[in-house]
UniProtKB/Swiss-Prot annotation:
InterPro entries: Ku70, Ku70/Ku80_beta-barrel_dom, Ku70_bridge/pillars_dom_sf, KU70_core_dom, Ku_C, Ku_N, SPOC-like_C_dom_sf, vWFA_dom_sf. Its main location: nucleus. It comes from Yarrowia lipolytica (strain CLIB 122 / E 150). Residues 514-537 are annotated as: Disordered. GO terms for molecular function: ATP binding; ATP hydrolysis activity; damaged DNA binding; DNA helicase activity; telomeric DNA binding. This is ATP-dependent DNA helicase II subunit 1. GO terms for cellular component: chromosome, telomeric region; Ku70:Ku80 complex. Single-stranded DNA-dependent ATP-dependent helicase. Involved in non-homologous end joining (NHEJ) DNA double strand break repair. DNA-binding is sequence-independent but has a high affinity to nicks in double-stranded DNA and to the ends of duplex DNA. Binds to naturally occurring chromosomal ends, and therefore provides chromosomal end protection. Required also for telomere recombination to repair telomeric ends in the absence of telomerase. KU70, of the KU70/KU80 heterodimer, binds to the stem loop of TLC1, the RNA component of telomerase. Involved in telomere maintenance.
Length: 585
């Protein structure tokens, strides 16, 4: 198989901060039905669309977003009681970068208490025309976007029963597919008592790869949030399974820290003129001794060797950094149990590998065979990884995923140079009765479904977005940030309040030992073979004011172990004072 390159330089791979450069156009299409108006689903859909639009403006400002309503005539804001009967397709926001005025219009619509009065619902919408309008809209507004998507929201499972209309609608959806526009249907159950029946219409018009499973209206925001930002590939490289066997894979970051200070979301602005202007920052190198400006061409990167500096040219740096072309080379296979302890030693965020036939035909089939073999045999692969030209090589484990998507998690491992010495710690064991009391608390506080990351947005990041949104839309800036990670103290008290009180009683009873017992224990410590008192023993003696019973030799041994000694005189009273001061007495 031959590696087919469609790029002038396919060795260059995007850095983590730049993995969102491919532009994405997202159109949120919402069907207006009488049922959606009556049960509030239309309100929820518009609110979710508003949140998606404002979030994308801040999170991925290079992407386009649009909002479209269909299935009803709409009353214009400017025309009083007049309805637009010419079309049942209304672009509330056309694909593009929306202005503050357009976003305010969408917000007014989402918050309108008389929303139902603004629409005249059609009994049988012409969906073939709706999908045709979407097609033309993408061609006109986002012709060169690498990613184009539609989130299609409806609660009507039978828009038509006419077989000719069903066939025409299927053709229109296929036209969108040929245009590389992906349609993601969000089919909402009409009510709590009635389930959306996809078999009546939507299973007939969408291809079998498209999910037509219905969801509840309460899941609207969660569904859209998951698809709000496109998960773009970080790199596209060859994976060498064995000599002569190479497949193409893409690497994705399933988890990437979102930062409010990303370079794509901020800019410096000059406000001293008649209107604000974007400012371009430039840096200038100067010498430390004379302060003279230096051209970039005259600079050399140097590395310190003792008291000397060793300069390198760009060519020399490139040469010493080169360890081969970008590749993921499998070195061998091991049982999963052989590497069970290595997960805690990961030196960077793991990545997710998925096959692609873009440059190497047959990659998906070969990759799937590798995945199935690793999963069925409970194996992991050890790999040598260079993800981009000039990057340092690194070792990684390739672990088959256990979820629906058949891919490999790439967990990076340290070299021997990266491993630091573990700190010397003292093993402290709790009393068995205290362990049992703690288990009782943990068992009653355990989350039924486990920890779910998607339920807890970053409070600091969301607070930043809310403030920026409010200032951009000239709204009142919120005073208090929303933090969903704040413990629910009342619920905790209801569930384990009595168990916590019992735990405190057990702790006090197990930690307060009679002075006679401590003395007996310390007598054992005084034997020549026992060594210095432990920190736990010494703290107990401080609390019971019996440090003076120790000999100077024992105090010196404890001081040497803890790197502590008196200043000046080293009499026994000085050692006792140092010990008490060390433990805050």
């Amino acid at each position: 198989m031959e590696w087919i390159s469609h790029l002038e330089n396919d060795d260059d791979v995007l850095e983590i901060e730049d993995y969102k450069v491919r532009k994405d156009a997202l159109l949120i299409a919402i069907q207006v039905t009488q049922n959606a108006i009556n049960n509030g689903t239309l309100h929820k859909a518009l609110e979710a669309a508003f949140d998606a639009v404002t979030d994308r403006i801040v999170i991925s400002p290079q992407d386009y977003t649009g909002v479209m309503l269909f299935g009803a005539s709409m009353q214009s804001e400017d025309d009083g009681d007049e309805f637009d009967d010419e079309s049942d397709t209304h672009f509330i926001l056309k694909l593009g970068l929306p202005t503050a005025a357009q976003i305010k219009r969408l917000k007014r619509l989402a918050e309108d208490p008389d929303l139902g009065e603004r629409f005249k619902v059609q009994e049988e919408p012409h969906l073939m025309d709706v999908f045709f309008d979407m097609n033309r809209h993408f061609i006109n507004m986002a012709p060169n976007f690498a990613s184009r998507r539609i989130i299609y929201i409806t609660d009507d499972d039978t828009p038509t029963t006419n077989e000719d209309d069903i066939n025409k609608t299927r053709v229109r959806i296929e036209d969108l597919s040929h245009l590389k526009v992906k349609v993601e249907p969000l089919l909402i159950n009409p009510s709590e008592d009635k389930t959306f029946d996809s078999s009546k219409f939507y299973a007939l018009v969408f291809n079998e790869d498209t999910s037509v499973e219905p969801v509840e209206a309460i899941d609207l925001k969660q569904f859209i949030n998951k698809r709000n930002v496109l998960n773009r590939s970080l790199f596209n490289v060859k994976m060498e399974i064995g000599e002569g066997l190479v497949v193409g894979v893409r690497g994705y970051l399933l988890y990437a820290e979102q930062k409010a200070t990303s370079t794509t979301r901020k800019a410096w602005v000059y406000t001293g003129g008649e209107k604000p202007e974007i400012a371009k920052l430039e840096s200038q190198a100067v010498t430390i001794e004379s302060g003279r400006s230096v051209d970039k061409a005259d600079l050399r990167k140097t590395f310190k060797f003792g008291n000397d500096y060793v300069p390198f040219t760009e060519e020399q740096l490139t040469q010493i950094r080169y360890f081969g072309e970008p590749i993921i080379r499998i070195l061998g296979f091991h049982n999963s149990s052989d590497f069970s302890e290595l997960f805690i030693h990961s030196v960077r965020s793991s990545m997710f590998l998925y096959p692609t036939d873009e440059k190497l035909v047959g990659s998906i089939r070969a990759f799937s065979a590798l995945y199935q073999s690793l999963k069925n045999k409970d194996k992991m692969a050890l790999a040598w990884v260079i993800v981009r030209k000039g990057a340092k090589p690194i070792l990684a484990l390739l672990i088959p995923s256990t979820k629906e998507i058949e891919g490999l998690h790439m967990v990076f491992l340290p070299f021997t140079d990266d491993i630091r010495q573990e700190p010397k710690t003292e093993l402290v064991s709790a009393a068995p009765e205290l362990v049992d009391a703690t288990k009782n608390i943990f068992t009653r506080l355990r989350m039924p479904g486990g920890f779910e990351s998607q339920r807890y947005p970053n409070p600091r990041l969301q607070w930043h977005y809310r403030v920026v949104r409010a200032m951009a839309l000239q709204e009142e800036v919120p005073k208090v940030p929303e933090d969903k990670t704040t413990p629910k103290y009342r619920s905790i008290d209801t569930r384990v309040g009595d168990a916590i009180e019992e735990w405190n009683k057990v702790l006090q009873s197990s930690s307060k030992r009679p002075a006679e017992d401590i003395c007996k224990a310390e007598k054992k410590v005084k034997s020549s073979d026992a060594g210095p008192p432990s920190n736990e023993q010494m703290q107990n003696m401080v609390e019971n004011d019996i440090v003076g019973k120790l000999t100077v030799a024992e105090l010196r041994a404890w001081g040497a172990a803890n790197n502590v000694e008196p200043n000046g005189s080293k009499l026994k009273k000085d050692w006792v004072e140092v010990v008490k001061k060390y433990y805050g007495k």
